[in-house]
Design a protein with these regions (language model features):
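C-terminal alpha-helical cap of glycosyltransferases
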Residues: 297-313
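Acidic donor-binding loop of glycosyltransferase active sites
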Residues: 43-45, 209-224, 231-232
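An amphipathic, basic-hydrophobic alpha-helix
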Residues: 13-45
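Glycosyltransferases and closely related glycan-assembly transferases
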Residues: 35-47, 53-69, 82-87
């Protein structure tokens, strides 16, 4: 294993907040601790994946002359990475046209690393169908709101669960902890074997393999995995993220006819209807699959590792 060091730091609130009064003290504390970590650990390279947590350490590393890399996962970078761009050696990106935000000469297109089990999921379709007890000849919809679930997505699915039964659609529904009991009760009442809810799905490789249509938030890593899978996707960006970067991520796919998008605020009314219409449109399914597959990057982890090794030679 490896040691985890925490910093007393948090993001700066865009609107007025008393929490902002603590920000200068948190920043100074984190810079001092980062300096101590670098002095003690003596790194040959420092990599930051963005956000306020990596800012102080990358800043101190660059001041000490330690080679530093930012891995920007989103299509729209946050303030921290924009500020760090001036001092780091290279910036790994997963989207095109990032020279709008960063110095072009520092950009390296690597994509985002995805989980090994997802890379090995393509030949597990039958295993996935059996595992989730799905009807063989029905389209399977996988709904994933992230590990904590997503209230609006859950409410949309729950309020229109009868549509899945009516339209003979299989459903694999990850709810998160807070919606687990309500979803279980609804699934029990509808009483269809191909419609199942789960607090958390450990076997995501099997869920992805079994799915024909996927409903997901638009986080950077999730999108990278969806590009690899090459299946029709309906994205519901979370509104509760800095810089609204999930909407930017989703829009970049929509612009390439690679995904459909439903705004979070509209999802209670429009999400299930969007799923239903997509399930009935084979041509659109094929177009979305074909286009999103063009965006996959299988070897992102290797690209980042190769760059890292070059910088420490």
């Amino acid at each position: 294993g490896y040691k985890i060091e925490g910093l007393w730091i948090s993001g700066f609130q865009r609107s007025f907040s008393r929490k902002n009064l603590l920000f200068p003290f948190k920043l100074i504390s984190s810079l001092i601790k980062s300096r101590k970590i670098i002095r003690r650990f003596q790194p040959d390279l420092v990599i930051g994946t963005g956000g306020f947590a990596s800012g102080p350490l990358l800043y101190e590393a660059s001041r000490k002359g330690v080679p530093s890399v930012v891995q920007e996962q989103n299509s729209y970078p946050g303030i921290t990475n924009k500020l760090l761009a001036k001092s780091v050696q290279k910036i790994c990106v997963a989207y095109e046209n990032m020279e709008r935000f960063f110095p072009k000469e520092k950009l390296i297109f690597t994509g985002n690393p995805i989980r090994k089990e997802i890379l090995n999921s393509s030949n597990k379709r039958e295993e996935g169908k059996n595992f989730f007890k799905l009807h063989n000849r029905r389209i399977t919809v996988l709904v994933v709101g992230g590990s904590l679930g997503a209230k609006t997505i859950n409410e949309s699915i729950n309020n229109h669960l009868g549509e899945f039964k009516k339209n003979k659609l299989n459903l694999i529904w990850q709810t998160g902890v807070s919606y687990e009991n309500q979803a279980k009760e609804s699934v029990k009442n509808i009483n269809v074997s191909g419609i199942q809810s789960y607090k958390f799905i450990k076997e995501m490789d099997l869920a992805y393999a079994a799915a024909d249509i996927i409903v997901s938030r638009a986080g950077a890593i999730a999108i990278s995995e969806l590009c690899f899978l090459g299946k029709p996707v309906v994205l519901v960006p979370s509104p509760n993220v800095a810089e609204d970067h999930q909407t930017q991520n989703a829009q970049s796919l929509v612009n390439k006819n690679s995904a459909l998008m439903v705004k979070d605020v509209e999802s209670r009314l429009k999400l299930v209807e969007k799923i239903k219409s997509l399930s009935e449109n084979k041509d659109l399914q094929e177009e979305l699959s074909r286009n999103i597959k063009k965006l996959e990057v299988k070897d992102a982890a290797d690209r980042i590792a190769d760059l890292s090794l070059e910088l420490v030679k």
